[in-house]
């Protein structure tokens, strides 16, 4: 929902729009009176998502079925003027509110933008895709009572990706060949503030091209400091990623997403990981007034570590289907099958049913 020229909207109308997501903000008139909220901005876009997740788990140590509120996000994207904007996103699903996105964006030109604050590192197409749009319910393996290391969980657990506090330079220059885009950033890193007088830093960079309509390729690099085995010494680790995507979210037809990543699992003992993940979906045209689309999906995600791999690396298989009822509002059903590398006979299973409200 977007509120334009918010300077003149009455305060009650703004509060009602934010809480209930009314189709449009009430318009003021010459006879309006009472308290007003005056905001010196051109536009505010309010959004929210609620994801209710029913899940099962084949792990004996946990209850076989459970229900949880997976995410409750409220967000506001602000355009102050053509040069200044930003975003604030909060998650209320846990015991306390958590800031997810919080940043200022300076739009110097299409080819040069500055982003300062808490935001995703420019690494991993799958991590950068909103959880309201991803084809499977979760980006990676999530099975209660287990800690499987598939592709996404490796990258996220090692903190080569995910959100971090820092400064990014990004853009897509007008007229650049193949629709070239880039992003480069320096971040506080997972060890920030915890290694005495040292200043660890995390770095990430990503470049993308679109040689054909709906066909995109990307390459990225991420680097972070690890603790050495003894003392406060730091050792640098690196990860590299290639990705490709064909198709678009919300568009009927075939949709393919894939990425391959490799890097340092632990710089202390020089172990490396290799991982890959691929999604496949096919979205139908609109089926009825209520049911906008049905999208069968399949996901393959593999994680591996050389020389003494952890017992929880392996392969994740996820068939599923999504029912869309307009916009991003959907009901999705997934069935995760986890095949650990150490013992493929110790297969884990998890069925998931998610109800998503998003606007």
What is the role of each PLM region?
Residues 10-23:
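Bacterial N-terminal signal peptides
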Residues 30-189, 197-203, 208-217, 272-284, ...:
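Outer membrane beta-barrel
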Residues 60-62, 194-198, 230-233, 268-271, ...:
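Short, solvent-exposed loop/turn segments at secondary-structure boundaries
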Residues 347-359:
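Outer-membrane beta-barrel "beta-signal"
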Residues 24-28:
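Boundary at the C-terminal end of the N-terminal hydrophobic targeting segment
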Residues 2-12:
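Bacterial N-terminal signal peptides that target proteins for export
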Residues 39-43, 208-306, 357:
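Detector for outer-membrane/organellar transmembrane beta-barrel domains
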Residues 285-332, 338:
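C-terminal hydrophobic structural anchor segments
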């Amino acid at each position: 929902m977007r509120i334009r020229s918010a300077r003149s909207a009455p305060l009650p109308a703004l509060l009602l729009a934010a809480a209930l997501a009314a189709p449009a903000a009430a318009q003021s008139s010459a006879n309006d009176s009472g308290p007003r909220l005056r905001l010196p901005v051109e536009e505010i876009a309010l959004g929210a998502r609620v994801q209710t997740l029913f899940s099962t788990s084949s792990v004996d140590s946990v209850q076989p079925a459970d229900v949880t509120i997976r995410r409750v996000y409220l967000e506001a994207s602000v355009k102050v003027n053509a040069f200044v904007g930003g975003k604030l996103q909060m998650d209320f699903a846990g015991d306390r509110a958590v800031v997810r996105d919080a940043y200022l964006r300076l739009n110097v030109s299409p080819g040069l933008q500055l982003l300062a604050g808490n935001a995703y590192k420019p690494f991993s197409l799958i991590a950068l895709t909103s959880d309201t749009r991803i084809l499977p319910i979760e980006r990676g393996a999530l099975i209660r009572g287990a800690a499987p290391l598939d592709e996404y969980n490796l990258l996220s657990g090692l903190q080569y990706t995910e959100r971090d506090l820092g400064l990014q330079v990004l853009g897509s220059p007008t007229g650049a060949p193949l629709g070239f885009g880039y992003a480069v950033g320096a971040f506080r890193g997972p060890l920030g503030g915890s290694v005495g007088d040292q200043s660890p830093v995390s770095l990430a960079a990503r470049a993308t091209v679109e040689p054909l309509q709906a066909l995109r390729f990307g390459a990225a690099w991420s680097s972070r400091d690890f603790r050495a085995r003894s003392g406060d010494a730091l050792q640098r680790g690196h990860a590299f990623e290639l990705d490709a995507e064909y198709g678009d979210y919300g568009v009927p037809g075939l949709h393919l997403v894939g990425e391959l990543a490799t890097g340092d699992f632990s710089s202390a003992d020089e172990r490396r990981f290799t991982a890959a993940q691929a999604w496949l979906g096919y979205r139908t045209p609109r089926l009825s007034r209520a049911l906008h689309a049905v999208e069968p999906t399949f996901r393959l995600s593999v994680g591996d570590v050389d020389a003494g791999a952890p017992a929880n690396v392996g392969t994740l298989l996820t068939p599923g289907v999504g029912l869309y009822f307009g916009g991003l509002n959907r009901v999705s059903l997934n069935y995760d099958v986890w095949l650990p590398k150490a013992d493929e006979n110790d297969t884990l299973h998890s069925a998931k049913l998610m109800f998503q409200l998003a606007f």
